[in-house]
Amino acid sequence: MTGGTGFIGSHLCEALIERGYHVTILVRPDDDTRWVDALPLARALGDITDKGSLTAAVRDVDCVFHLAAILGAPDPQLYFRVNGEGTRNLVQACLESPRPPRRFLLASSIAAMGPSGKHRTYNEEAPCRPLSDYGKSKWQSEQELHRLDGRLPWTIVRLPLVFGPRSKGGLFPLMRVVNKGIKLRMGDGQTNVAYVGDIVDGMIAAIESNNTIGQTYLIGESPPYSWKEIMDAMARSMNRRAISIRLPFHLLYLISPISMAIGWLRRRRPFLHLRNVAYLRHRYWRVDTRKAERDFDYTSRHRLADGLALTARWYSDQHLL
């Protein structure tokens, strides 16, 4: 597994081990491994941007989960080097292995499709028109699999806005604001969301099914929520009475570079990244998950309120709220 030390990846490691799988994660020397240090798994030293370092990592593995990606790159070209070329390196290492993996799952993003617009709900057949460099790089990573012509059995899952314990991005900055008694009004947009546990279950179900080979899937909770519904659910999850404040997007565009600079200086994830503002600015990210429900019985066990309650409790226990 690549990205096994991260937010989603560490939860995936736990779930796979609980199911009896033997897990090997790709790690770099400077990776923060706190979430997986106590798990009975193997580690392979390597980096997806260095193809030569991947040879040993993919040797004698049955399945590959490719979750590693860069989200907040200071240089736009890093998105394509890590997300696009990194996927190509990993795929080539798999193909050159004496015993190539039987399955390969890529964790992509709805950013690879671009926003749906107010009156559409995207499914997997919708044309991809990514707007951000991140979205374009994830689209590039998907194309690396489409070029394989059956040489490696692959599956792509496109993830929506994922939240849950251990996340320092996504909904976490908004939850911190709500915890201070403020609900931001961000227009009438809608987006699909997903609790991390449901995403993990979905990825495992997808790679265990023979129906999913050569297919792309949208997974997450359906139907989408309005941002007002999300903000209200956050306040309830933390038992907070919050006032609604309209925050103009042009102000967010002014704040985000300052937040990014402070984050870079402090070597921490910025409170507000320009990529997040762009995501919010294009307000409608509506997707249809029925193909996943049909092909491998995907379901979201956690509704937004349930997932936020679990998430808020974890943040509180970690003294992050």
Label for each model-derived stretch:
Residues 129-155:
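Active-site Tyr-X1-5-Lys
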Residues 1-19:
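N-terminal Rossmann NAD(P)H-binding glycine-rich loop of SDR-like oxidoreductase domains
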Residues 32-35, 41-85, 95, 113:
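NAD(P)H-binding glycine-rich loop region in Rossmannoid oxidoreductase-like domains
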Residues 49, 78-89, 128, 132, ...:
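Glycine-rich NAD(P)-binding loop of the Rossmann-fold in SDR/ketoreductase-type enzymes
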Residues 209-271, 289, 305, 309-312, ...:
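Mid/C-terminal beta-alpha module of Rossmann-like enzyme folds, strongest
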Residues 176-194, 198, 202-206, 210-211, ...:
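A conserved pocket-lining segment of Rossmann-fold NAD(P)-dependent short-chain dehydrogenase/reductase
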Residues 88-133:
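Conserved Rossmann-fold NAD(P)-dependent oxidoreductase catalytic core, especially the SDR/UDP-sugar
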